[in-house]
Amino acid sequence: MHERNRRLLPQVFALLLFGCMSSQAASASADAAPVSAGAQLPDVILISLDTTRADHLSLYGYPLPTSPNLARFADRAVVFQKARTVVPLTGPSHASLFTSLYPHQHGLFRNGIPIREDIPTLAGMLAQQGYDTAAFVSGWTLKRKICGLDSGFRVYDEGFTQRYKFLNQERPAEEVTRAVADFLASGSYRRPLFLFIHYFDPHAPYRRHSVQWEELFDAAARIGWDIDKEVLAYDNEVAYMDHHLGSLLEILGSQGLMSNAIVWILGDHGESLGEHDYWGHGRRVYEQTLHVPMVLYAPGKMPDHAEIGELASTLDVLPTTLGLLGISPPPGHPLEGRDLSGYLASGKPLPAGRQYFETFKGTWRKFTRILAPEVPDEPSLLGCYEGHIKYILEADSNHIEIYDISVDTSETENLASQMGSGFSDAELLSWFHKGRSLEPVTVDLSTEDVNQLKSLGYIN
């Protein structure tokens, strides 16, 4: 595919590979351990900003005003400066968010396959505690039939509009916010409420919003920045989303849902905008696609404002939420993330440790061959963070890249030939295989589903 068309079709091919958990996890009950009777549980609100890279938000120092509403919200919240996703794809990253498992553990490697019903999710855990649960999604990859993440939700609102005729069905932020507002105004819910809201706008193809476009263009001109129009188009979508995020936060406040609440706002993955000669996400694991915004608001449980400089992961969201609620995870459910609630409340530094990531890249033929049992279904790219050192292994070629991201945020100087590796490729692959127990299965998709996945770049 020609590189100049890459923003219109991200360079991601679909691997329809679905797996099951190990027998211990698969047999585990979805019932989370109950809290004490009469406990006043707060509402839980999780807002996902699809395809949103941290360094293109004004909250994280970007010179253009792409996220003023998120920045205002963050003034009274905990801001994670170094949050990372574990996989740069929408379906797998959200499955990891809702299960605190890596893709090779929950089995949702690629967009287009639903997660197993017997894997406990955050929605199911909260429903077991008496929460009402409602989700509002805006991208085809999170459609219930595609991802299966509707499990545990009483309401799973996925009303899409055909923005580009028969292709790229999605809901713009304005419509998502309106749907949430209508739901809350109807009063057809009970408290405590778990509310999941998903914005998809920064995902390619980017469309132009005149108000935000002019504001950003003028801001760039004022600082003498001749900004690339494709980059401006991405920023324009981020700013449009932020505008409606501001409206959403006002609506939540007017409904009394912010006074006793746990609110997460975070990105599921980022977007490469030409760095490393790549546009899109899914086929690279550089910082542009892994470094995401993550903000936590929990009045009375967290400091009024704090900035966390240690490494954090989207896998930490589920266990931290349960920790804030005083809920134990289901027996046998192997959470990979950490409960950060005690560290955040006390102001202690977050614990150090390795954090892993993975993705596939390559051709559709290669991915389909992976479905055959005689072909090892290993990721093409995997790696880990250890402190400020980042390791990347290209499994096909055993090529290793090592970066010191504390001084080389653009990952331009590979240190593999200059320093001893803190891991071996065998060690990384051992970690991968130790946690997996996958059985390839097939899933029937409608012609419409296939066309939508093609339009989003997930099937060649």
Feature map (PLM): residue ranges:
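Bacterial N-terminal signal peptides that target proteins for export
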Residues: 2-12
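Catalytic domains that recognize anionic headgroups
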Residues: 19-460
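Bacterial N-terminal signal peptides
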Residues: 10-21
